[in-house]
UniProtKB/Swiss-Prot annotation:
It is found in: Cytoplasm. This is Ribosomal RNA small subunit methyltransferase G. The keyword Methyltransferase applies. The keyword Acyltransferase does not apply. It comes from the Bacteria. SUPFAM superfamilies: S-adenosyl-L-methionine-dependent methyltransferases. The lineage of its organism: Bacteria, Bacillati, Cyanobacteriota, Cyanophyceae, Nostocales. Belongs to the methyltransferase superfamily. RNA methyltransferase RsmG family. One of its GO terms (molecular function) is rRNA (guanine-N7-)-methyltransferase activity. Keywords: Cytoplasm, Methyltransferase, rRNA processing, S-adenosyl-L-methionine, Transferase. Its main location: cytoplasm. It comes from Nostoc sp. (strain PCC 7120 / SAG 25.82 / UTEX 2576).
């Protein structure tokens, strides 16, 4: 099995001012192997080469939580985190590996993806993560999930406005949504500012960076929950993406 680049330690250090411990590195390696194995039966990800996996899945997942010192501290101390549309477990599983004091809820609407993640969690003995088959629009209206989380992560689930509608209702006051995006435009800034404001949020930071191996453009948006989300949000299943705020 291809070794998942232990020589990346220096790049972790240079870019995130952090390095995985040996046991975290071993779990990253095991995660990579399990995903390659799972890909034989399920179409989980087209990213399978070790360098690409490292950069686009591991590094990218962790880069999203790295720039905010307050966020890192809260993950280290123990935060309640939800990852919406986690797919094969990104960014939630790498975050669960590095933030062992936090609880990570991994949500996806596709049962077969969640069944696969259940296997990953059990193989990696990741007891701080749990799974849920559901849609963001549904759990956003359920009292056991609405306004219950400190951090909501969302990567590659849609444009920023629906992502704001999926995540902000789930956050406690003061909580933070991290929306992982590729390219970004000024028009998107205007539309997400408007969406966030209607949902009780504010745009705290739009972080623009490139990935360390292929210089690919990335953006992460950080939305802070500053007021209660009005009861009519999130709207019914499908509406946030079909009729963005
Ligand atoms: C392109 S994949 C991204 C997976 C992962 N976040 C990543 O970055 O590799 C989008 C995932 O979001 C899930 N999804 C889409 N809309 C959703 C919703 N409203 N609620 C929950 N999951 C959703 C899909 O089932 C799919 O697994």
């Amino acid at each position: 099995m291809t070794n998942l680049l232990p020589e990346m330690a220096e790049i972790w250090q240079q870019t995130l001012n952090w390095q995985p411990t040996d046991s975290q590195q071993a779990r990253f390696q095991q995660l990579y192997e399990l995903i390659l194995e799972g890909n034989r039966q399920l179409n989980l990800t087209r990213i399978t080469e070790p360098q690409e996996f490292w950069e686009k899945h591991l590094w990218d997942s962790l880069r999203g939580v790295a720039p905010q010192q307050q966020l890192i501290s809260s993950l280290q101390l123990g935060a309640s985190v939800i990852d919406i549309g986690t797919g094969a477990g990104f960014p939630g599983v790498p975050v669960a590996i590095i933030a062992s004091n936090s609880t990570i809820t991994l949500v996806d609407s596709t049962r077969k993806k969640i069944t696969f993640i259940d296997t990953i969690l059990s193989e990696l003995a990741l007891t701080n993560a749990k799974t849920l088959v559901s849609r963001a629009e549904e759990i956003g209206q359920q009292p056991q999930h609405r306004e219950q989380y400190d951090v909501a992560l969302i990567r590659a689930v849609g444009t920023a406005s629906p992502c704001a509608e999926y995540t902000l209702p789930l956050l406690k006051l003061g909580g933070l949504a991290v929306i992982y995006r590729g390219t970004w435009t000024e028009e998107e800034t205007t539309s997400v500012e408007n969406a966030a404001q209607q949902l009780g949020g504010t745009v705290e930071l739009i972080d623009n960076f490139t990935t360390p191996l292929t210089n690919s453009v990335r953006h992460c948006l950080y939305l802070r929950k500053v007021a209660k989300t009005p009861a009519n949000f999130p709207r019914a299943v499908g509406v946030p993406s079909q009729k963005p705020i």
